[in-house]
């Protein structure tokens, strides 16, 4: 049997990722022996969801470690399947530019991130294949799995261009948002498998939950723009920014999307006022996100339903978590642990809100008036039924 080193680099990379993916797949296969197809797919989706959450946090660690260019090509590292094979190239790059982005440690961080991303992609491919074959038995459309597979391919392209375009801020931010969309797609599928409706009353509809999710996603995009432009420390102090309530800001340059990292749209260095504008936009819009989440949490708490109240507590807890980690980033000088906690909290908010919307959406059709003929006069009368929780 040929050794792994005997294969071409790209094939070695595929084989290596396949071997890594065997671990979760074997665990899933052994644990779900004899289970129904829906149970097996639900468990596989939950496993993929867990790894996707980890991938988002580790992606933040990769970016915060300045390891995004630890391997400056894609998908391998200097044409090799791992930094082991690229040891000589990495040493040469580090010797040529000791303070540059290429080191052995950064190369490993970047490649571990890629391995994990490829494993997630492979698990999604397996789930999509099974969903397509067992489409008649699924409680929801097989196109959800197909859409997730298509989206993870798009995410792979974002990952590629993040590296090949040298951390182009718009691409890096799109890569972050794409990860959040992928997380939401997996949460939706997991909830559809379980089909647990949650009836919302007191003027709260699924549309309202979706609106709050949109506000949170916009706030995450602004936070991603802060991180990718390294504008976290553009403001020191809180609640003021650099001892001013309204500092000088250049929103025009700060929110020019088509530009290189650290440069304006004209190719000059990005001025400090632009970085302040980027930071302040995230800080100010946080007030809108705060208001939306507090309102939703309060309305959920008033539902007089144990499940709704759990969602209220989860959202309130994540809101406190985000406020504490966000403030820690500013007042403590952007410590790694606070930055990672902030990224994890953002992903948690997306997951909880998506789950809430999915469960409310399942319940909503059952609350629509059902018209049945009157046994007396043949008139149509509306009857309203509530689904089982």
Language-model-derived ranges and their functions:
Residues 1-36:
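Transmembrane alpha-helices
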Residues 21-31, 128-129, 187-190, 296-298, ...:
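Alpha-helical transmembrane segments
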Residues 8-17, 107-126, 170-184, 277-295, ...:
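Membrane-interface loop-to-helix entry segments
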Residues 2-4, 58-71, 153-176, 225-237, ...:
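Interfacial helix-loop-helix junctions of multi-pass membrane proteins
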Residues 44-66, 215-226:
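N-terminal signal-anchor transmembrane alpha helix
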Residues 129-146, 203, 297-315:
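Membrane-interface helix-loop-helix junctions at transmembrane boundaries of multi-pass membrane enzymes
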Residues 185-204, 208, 351-389:
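A juxtamembrane structural motif centered on a specific transmembrane helix
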Residues 64-110, 232-275:
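Extracytosolic (periplasmic/ER-lumenal) interhelical loops and adjacent juxtamembrane/interface segments
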